[in-house]
Amino acid sequence: MNLKNAIFGGSVTGISDRSGAYDGSIQAWLPIKDIVQGVVVTRDKRFVKILELLPVNFYTMSSMDKSAAIEDFAAYLKIAPANLQINVLTQPFDLDGYLKLLRGYLERETNEQCRLMLEESMDYVPQLVEREALTHRFFLSFSYDPSMKAPDHTPEAIAAVLNEKAEVARRYLDRCGVAVLEPEYADNFILELFYKLINKHTSQHLRLPDGVFDMLGMVHGVYDEEALKALDTAAAESAGKKKRKWFSRKEASPLSRLEAGATTIPDLIAPPDIDTHHPDYLLIDGVCHAYLYISGYGYSTVVGKGWLTPLIEAGEGVSLSFYLVKQPREKTVNAIGQTTMINRSRMRDVGDTRQDFEELGDAIGAGLYLKEGMNREGQDFYYMHTLIEVIADDPDTLEQRVTAEETLCVAS
């Protein structure tokens, strides 16, 4: 390992090519390359860990418990990865999955009264679904960065580091009252999650088969590990060789796994069709997708506890993504100090009757507030980005939902 790799992390090696795709295909459009030990590998060689959370009802907590939960989450942010993403997925209630869960409870239950309650629930829940019952799923994801310092730059080592970070997040979130789901097979969980996210229509009537990872072979039904290893080794050696001289004998290049007939991760999650030509929305698997972004001045200056609840409870077809990006402390404090000093010097030349007098005063007050929080209270500075996804089965319904969401954002 050279000095550059030791300091900056170097490049990742040993990534298997389970994502081969032809140019212009739907598979090539997808950003996902592989799934390793419950970690998503993207085409630009980023590694992302995804956790599903079971939320707590914030409004049923006492004032003391609310404050404690906020403080515990703030404590987690101090040691959390620099890039966090919180997703709130709104989708129709999964009746089949819930009834399957109740049947499992019913088989294990020995108390007759409890069995009667479970049977009543199994009869009543389908009636709720007829009234368009919705469910929310919450996810926390973070990506690998060189500061995490994996022992070596292999996908397995990076996945191990991210799984350790996930255990830390699980402990801190448990103190907040938020449980983290632990799937039995993490790779299958991630694969099924993306399949449902991308194929919103198809996934309702066509599920991935059990043991779907066994399909990732040269030819489905044929599992020759030695052939796979030899193919990967030959492809890696071919990519690493220097340019041949003009008089060298040209050897036949080895087949890629795609050309050899391999089934890949993108093959399993790719939608039947994608249309990106409309200026207002994407059409994926027959579902229209539109996206709204809240600008920097779109947030209220002062907010209370649970201030994002109206957006989360916006209704059917509306999902949210919150991106939190931690900024370096020293660099941020210096930038805030310089900006505040410049604003103070400008304040001397601005009369109190000018329109920007109050704006400069507010900017100076905000700068002093941020500096005090970071210097005296040890707080960190984060940039927050909010992306709203709106989906519908047809363009007219999509336009109505987008308009309603824009109105809700203005009112909030």
Give the role of each language-model region.
Residues 2-412:
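Extended, folded cores of ATP/NTP-driven motor/assembly subunits in large transport
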